[in-house]
């Protein structure tokens, strides 16, 4: 909705390769995924976020939750009903782990500014573990502090620089698929 409003778009029409009005114009395309590593400074922030998340997983396991080593948002979301009905002492670490997972995903995929905006919005809410996360979790607060420093230095996600580099070296038409997140 926000994108449509910003572009002053009133209606959307969905098409794909097999749509009758599109099919005659489909050409062979070359798709290339270009992996982009985070900068060393961003990896430090990422490490602090992962340590904060690991601490929640340790606490949840200590409280009797069976969680795999594969840390995923879906695993945490699936544990909500069990925790709310049968293991209330795990509510705080569970909901905090969910928030950290969201923050980590935003940081890795979208960069520093969306991560900090997410943190600002989350900090202003009320809920299980928010105060602890933003006031006493040394790893999470250190990640925010480092991210603010990087933002002040003009550092964002390295995918933007990589995209610019690729576009300067290509002479053909290019389609860029992007994920937009600011919520």
Sequence positions of predicted segments:
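Conserved C-terminal "switch" segment of AAA+ ATPases
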Residues: 24-25, 36
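Helicase motor interdomain insertion/brace
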Residues: 3, 9-23, 41-183
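Short glycine-/polar-rich loops that comprise or flank the Walker A/P-loop
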Residues: 7-10, 29-31
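Short amphipathic
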Residues: 14, 30-36
